Amino acid sequence: MNPVNYLYLAALLFAIGASGVLVRRNAIVVFMCVELMLNACNLALVTFSRMHGNLDGQIVAFFTMVVAAAEVVVGLAIIVSLFRSRHSASVDDASLMKL
């Protein structure tokens, strides 16, 4: 398969994730869309790495996935805290959590 097709797929996934972040109000859905955007960037990194014949992009994508795993833990903890305090997972309610 042509590597350019993978870049088109990465751009499509990033656009879907960006539109989900801008349109949706549910914190869990917004969080999933951010993760989709991150995975689209990883796909582009691996594709560019494969096109140029070195492993740098694949290594960066691997470390990005490790950091994303930690991000999932922190993000879900914040969403659970929001749901427990406001009984809603809406992004609009997150602004009410200020000290």
Swiss-Prot record:
TM helices/strands, residue ranges: 3-23, 28-48, 59-79
Gene name linked to the record: nuoK1
Family assignment from sequence similarity: Belongs to the complex I subunit 4L family.
Subunit structure comment from the entry: NDH-1 is composed of 14 different subunits. Subunits NuoA, H, J, K, L, M, N constitute the membrane sector of the complex.
Name of the protein this chain belongs to: NADH-quinone oxidoreductase subunit K 1
Pfam families linked to this entry: Oxidored_q2
Membrane topology of the entry: Multi-pass membrane protein
EC number, as in UniProt: 7.1.1.-
Annotated keywords: Cell membrane, Membrane, NAD, Quinone, Translocase, Transmembrane, Transmembrane helix, Transport
Function: NDH-1 shuttles electrons from NADH, via FMN and iron-sulfur (Fe-S) centers, to quinones in the respiratory chain. The immediate electron acceptor for the enzyme in this species is believed to be a menaquinone. Couples the redox reaction to proton translocation (for every two electrons transferred, four hydrogen ions are translocated across the cytoplasmic membrane), and thus conserves the redox energy in a proton gradient.
GO cellular component: NADH dehydrogenase complex; plasma membrane
Example GO biological process: ATP synthesis coupled electron transport
InterPro entries membership: NADH_UbQ_OxRdtase_chain4L/K, NUOK/Mnh_C1-like
Organism of derivation: Streptomyces griseus subsp. griseus (strain JCM 4626 / CBS 651.72 / NBRC 13350 / KCC S-0626 / ISP 5235)
GO molecular function, one term: NADH:ubiquinone reductase (non-electrogenic) activity
Localization terms from the record: Cell membrane
Catalysed reactions, as listed in the record: a quinone + NADH + 5 H(+)(in) = a quinol + NAD(+) + 4 H(+)(out)
Main subcellular localisation: membrane
